[in-house]
């Protein structure tokens, strides 16, 4: 079953409101951090939301996806622009996996030869 993104966004807003009541400084700090990157407005709201969507996908954050999809649409992002941003996210994830694969090979090289030869015979 597909997620009802509009309902999910409402549930998130209610949850964040509750956190804000319990810990207002947490929400205040988040809002200050969130607005800090927007002060110069060099990228524009639509571009910031497209970047946020790409990051949301790489972080696998459903809450981020629902909030930033709505915001991207509100700021004029087209379906094609969103798809391109998601393509960038997919490529970065694949690139990161490839880069981290080299770390596995480095780790393998550090194991004693006796251990690595036992593993290769298994």
Predicted regions and their residues:
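Short cysteine clusters
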Residues: 61-64
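Immediate flanking context of iron-sulfur cluster ligation sites
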Residues: 42-59, 80-89
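Acidic, glycine/proline-rich low-complexity segments that act as flexible tails and inter-domain linkers
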Residues: 1-47, 100-122
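C-terminal structural segments of small proteins and small subunits
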Residues: 83-108
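Charge-rich, acidic-biased intrinsically disordered regions
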Residues: 76-88, 112-122
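Amphipathic alpha-helical segments within well-ordered protein domains
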Residues: 34-35, 52, 69-73
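Iron-sulfur (Fe-S) cluster-binding segments and ferredoxin-like electron-carrier domains
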Residues: 27, 67-81, 105-108
């Amino acid at each position: 079953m597909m997620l009802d993104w509009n309902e999910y966004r409402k549930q998130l807003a209610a949850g964040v409101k509750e956190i804000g009541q319990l810990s207002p400084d947490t929400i205040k700090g988040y809002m200050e951090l969130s607005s800090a990157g927007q002060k110069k407005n060099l990228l524009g709201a639509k571009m910031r939301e497209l970047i946020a969507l790409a990051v949301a996908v790489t972080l696998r954050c459903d809450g981020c996806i629902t909030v930033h999809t709505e915001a991207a649409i509100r700021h004029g992002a087209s379906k094609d622009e969103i798809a391109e941003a998601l393509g960038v996210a997919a490529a970065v994830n694949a690139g990161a996996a490839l880069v981290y694969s080299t770390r596995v090979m480095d780790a393998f090289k550090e194991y004693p030869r006796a251990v690595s030869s036992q593993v290769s015979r298994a």
